Amino acid sequence: MADKADKMKARLPRGFVDRVPDDLRAAEKMMATIREVYDLYGFEPVETPLVEYTDALGKFLPDQDRPNEGVFSFQDDDEQWLSLRYDLTAPLARYVAENFETLPKPYRSYRNGWVFRNEKPGPGRFRQFMQFDADTVGAPNVSADAEMCMMMADALERLGIQRGDYAIRVNNRKVLDGVLDAIGLEGEGNAAKRLNVLRAIDKLDKFGPEGVRLLLGKGRLDESGDFTKGAQLPEAAIEKVLAFTAAGGADGAQTIANLQAVVAGNAKGEEGVQELADMQALFFAGGYEGRVKIDPSVVRGLEYYTGPVFEAELLFDVTNEDGQKVVFGSVGGGGRYDGLVSRFRGEPVPATGFSIGVSRLMTALKNLGKLDVSDTVGPVVVLVMDKDTQNLGRYQKMVSDLRKAGIRAEMYVGGSGMKAQMKYADRRAAPCVVIQGSQEREAGEVQIKDLVEGKRLSAEIEDNVTWRESRPAQITVREDGLVDAVREILDAQARDRAEQSK
């Protein structure tokens, strides 16, 4: 026996999670529904590897000798740096560039998979998580961006989220660029200050207009006494930015009119507003008014995107860790990224896409009761009473017959006795067990114990009359009638579940 001190400690790395069967089934059920919508729109699946050359990812390269800030990186045997992908978009850009001549343009694809971030983990922040993306590469017109928004709205509704409980919010990088240019922040030399402005606007939901005003100016002192330095804009520039964030109107037409007034005279800003107007016309024509909204307060990701940017937000309340009611918030986002594929091609390649945070959307659906996998039926367990080779073969035949009939089934392969086997079947959520001892075998029979009915009877039946009138929890049938008898039990249980769910 190994010394206790030599035992390896079983421990999960920080920032990672194990996924149990219910979570896996729930995720697959949700993603299958999303795939149905994306397929309906004519998008095709594609899969890229988890590992890419680090320079193909492009975003995180602070140190060429050790480029693992933000990503998990390693060197291969020819000393080239490789990294685990941090999103699904950069690998898609590489794939499209590498196969550009053979792919149809526009190229419409979707993919789901794990992504990795080499960042400090915390509550709700993991180093490995799943995304589900859809992208169109090679479409310069904003009709492709509008389609992304409409497809996301349809996916949320197909998942059971009602109208009024979600909104796809849309903005345009060019509009904000027009505002920033108008206040003197044009050009790469002002990149840091532009980013500070974006970060300030992103706090609008959290701090309100006055909080954003402070962050655009000298800075903001919070309740704990911490001071956040502001963007140091002059008062006139602050008013211009706040006018942009407050441009949202009663409907899309009013919002667009307000934005036109804010960027009047700036060509880039006016181009962005026109793109929003074109998208709004498509939303109206498709019947998506109220579901997809033009919203100037959307700034998340604007430093990355080159045109329209969109965010899927769930509007219902949930209780946070402090017991407070809060709006659930974002479950995905995207936008136009015309520069990403162009890095490989040396020529303009327009692209737009949308990414769903799978775990976050799963949490939302569970809160709404829209992702119930409790109807998953465990396997029928054939108990093993005699372990000699000949009788094991008989048990194996029973299992095979059940499986051929499309019934989940397993033969107990442990080494324990009858009591432990019954406990095992209960922990496996088995709907019933099959028992054949020597007496049943000689008679050519099997016993089938309905575990679901047995639990119900033991909890509910108080007198012998009721017991006799109930469906019996254990029956004996001919061996050749096993499959039919098990199917009858499973069908009865399914009817009971359906009745209880009404």
Curated annotation (Swiss-Prot):
GO terms for molecular function: ATP binding; histidine-tRNA ligase activity. CDD domains: HisRS-like_core, HisRS_anticodon. GO terms for cellular component: cytoplasm. Keywords: Aminoacyl-tRNA synthetase, ATP-binding, Cytoplasm, Ligase, Nucleotide-binding, Protein biosynthesis. InterPro entries: aa-tRNA-synth_II, aa-tRNA-synth_II/BPL/LPL, Anticodon-bd, Anticodon-bd_dom_sf, His-tRNA-ligase, HisRS-like_core, HisRS/HisZ, HisRS_anticodon. It catalyses: tRNA(His) + L-histidine + ATP = L-histidyl-tRNA(His) + AMP + diphosphate + H(+). Its EC number is 6.1.1.21. It is found in: Cytoplasm. It comes from the Bacteria. Signal peptide: none annotated. GO terms for biological process: histidyl-tRNA aminoacylation. Homodimer. Belongs to the class-II aminoacyl-tRNA synthetase family. NCBIfam families: hisS. PANTHER family: HISTIDINE--TRNA LIGASE (PTHR11476:SF7), HISTIDYL-TRNA SYNTHETASE (PTHR11476). This is Histidine--tRNA ligase. It comes from Brucella ovis (strain ATCC 25840 / 63/290 / NCTC 10512).
